[in-house]
Amino acid sequence: GWLYGNGGAGGQGATAGAGGAGANGVSSTNGGGTGGNGGIGGTGGAGGAGGNAGLLGVGGAGGHGASGGAGDRGGAGGTGFISSDGGAGGDGGDGGNGGAGGTGGLLFGAGGNGGPGGSGGAADIGGNGGAGNGGGTDGNGGNGGSGGGAGSGGDGGGAGGNGAWLFGNGGAGGGGGKGGNGAGGGLGGGSFGLPGLNGSGGDGGDGGNGAPGGVLYGNGGAGGQGSSGGIGGPGATGGAGGKGGDGGDAQLIGDGGNGGNGGAGGTGGTPGPGGPGGSGGLGGLLFGQTGTAGVSP
């Protein structure tokens, strides 16, 4: 409806087809419609974009990407209007990236969180998470989505969204998938791309944990590197560095994986703390050494 009704949801995609976009909200408290989910197929369909909000409505969530041979990305969240938040990004299908979070409204809207990446297949790596940016003067950036896990090591998490130009805090980086690296936190709000006076930096993403070794033979995977914290403003704190991922355990014969190093703290009026290192994986029950623990910067 033109005054209060929410936008309609997008339709479900046909086999291997993309989901439809959610309808836009028009006025008052209208929220945007949710994007349709992608159809299941050999390369799963993309999720539809969430509808944009009306006057006070929240942006619609992006549709989820379908699971398929390669997967597809989740739809982007819709944009908030005046003081409303952006919609969340859709989940990635297997092997697909998460959708980006929608941008916050013009005055105070927070950015939507990025959707998580889908799990990787036997050979695929997981997708990256998306990120949303804060709108207006003090909208906070959305958090980056987590990276998907995978047999060959997960991909990194999404970067945190940037805070709005005056007071917004940066969003936190998403955690890495198994064996992957987390992405860095977003910048605190700043005018023309510079850190604002009161915007804190987003925390860095944690590194993903290493996968265990094979049942009989095989070394554990190494933990992912934690990412650096985002930059804070002169009157604010830099983001904390992400934790290093733990090394994977060997099972019977093999060495444990090394732990990932922690990320550096972000700069700012007060620097953020560095992230702790991950623990080393255990060696095999019959033969094998314990992995080396990661260090904090």
Describe the residue ranges of each PLM region.
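Long, compositionally biased tandem-repeat segments
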Residues: 1-297
